[in-house]
Amino acid sequence: MSAEEQDTRSGGIQVIARAAELLRVLQAHPGGLSQAEIGERVGMARSTVSRILNALEDEGLVASRGARGPYRLGPEITRMATTVRLGVVTEMHPFLTELSRELDETVDLSILDGDRADVVDQVVPPQRLRAVSAVGESFPLYCCANGKALLAALPPERQARALPSRLAPLTANTITDRAALRDELNRIRVDGVAYDREEQTEGICAVGAVLRGVSVELVAVSVPVPAQRFYGREAELAGALLAWVSKVDAWFNGTEDRK
C-alpha cells in the first residue's frame, strides 16, 4: 500500500470514528442537540460537525427539524436496533430455554432502553406457581434484578443519566436512597449478580446478570421466582445463573466448542 493510500485509509477511519462519536452524543440526548451543542460536546470544529451531520442525515442516521437542528437519531437507527434485537432474541432463545429447564423457573431476556429494561424474550416453565411478566413490558432499572444488573454495567456518567431524580418506591422493599443503591451497584459489579427481593413487585423476587459480547446493546438475563420459593434458594439460583452466563459468553466469544 502506497503512502497516499495509507493516508486515505487513515482519513476514512477517522471520519467513521468521528461520526460514531456524534451518534453516541445524540444517543445520550434523545431530546436533540443543535450543531453548536454537538460541537461543544465532541470538541470538533463546527464545519466538521456540519459536514458529518449532513452525511449522516442523508443516510437517515440522524434527523433534524431545520438547517441548524435540533438533531436527533434518525429512523434508520431505529430500524437497525430492531434488527439487532430480533437477532439477539433468535440466538439467545435456546440458551434461555436451557436455563429455564435447569432451574424450572421463568427466564427473561432484557435490553437496556434509556432508563428502563425492556423484556424482549421469555421462557416460562410448566410450574403451576410461577413468576411471569410479558414480552414487551418495561421496568425501571433501579428496582428489578435485570435493571440493576444493567445499571451496574454502565459507566458512571451513563448510570447517572439512567436514574430518575427520585427513586419512587414500588413496594416497601424498593431501594429509594441513592447512596444505598450506589452501594448495591458496586456490589453487583464485584459479584456479577443482581438481586430483586420484592423490590419491584410484592411476592416476586429475582436474580439477574449482564451478558457481555452477545450484542452491541447491553443485554441482561433474569430469573424471577415467587418469593416463597426464592428465599433459601438465593445462592443456588445465583450460582446457576453465573455458571450459565459464563457458558453463554464463552460461546458467543468463540471460546467454547460449538459442536
Curated annotation (Swiss-Prot):
Residue intervals of the HTH iclR-type domain: 13-75
Record's keyword terms, sorted: DNA-binding, Transcription, Transcription regulation
Name of the protein described by the UniProt record: HTH-type transcriptional regulator Rv1719
Upper taxonomic lineage: Bacteria, Bacillati, Actinomycetota, Actinomycetes, Mycobacteriales
Any single GO BP term: negative regulation of DNA-templated transcription
Keyword Mitochondrion: no
Assembly mode: Homodimer.
CDD domains: HTH_CRP
Entries under SUPFAM superfamilies matching the protein: GAF domain-like, Winged helix' DNA-binding domain
GO molecular function, a single term: DNA-binding transcription factor activity
InterPro entries associated with the record: Cro/C1-type_HTH, GAF-like_dom_sf, HTH_CRP, HTH_MetabolicPath_Reg, Tscrpt_reg_IclR_C, Tscrpt_reg_IclR_N, WH-like_DNA-bd_sf, WH_DNA-bd_sf
General function of this protein: Binds to the upstream region of Rv1714 and probably modulates the expression of the downstream gene(s).
Residues covered by the IclR-ED domain: 88-259
DNA-binding region(s) in UniProt: 35-54
Species the sequence originates in: Mycobacterium tuberculosis (strain ATCC 25618 / H37Rv)
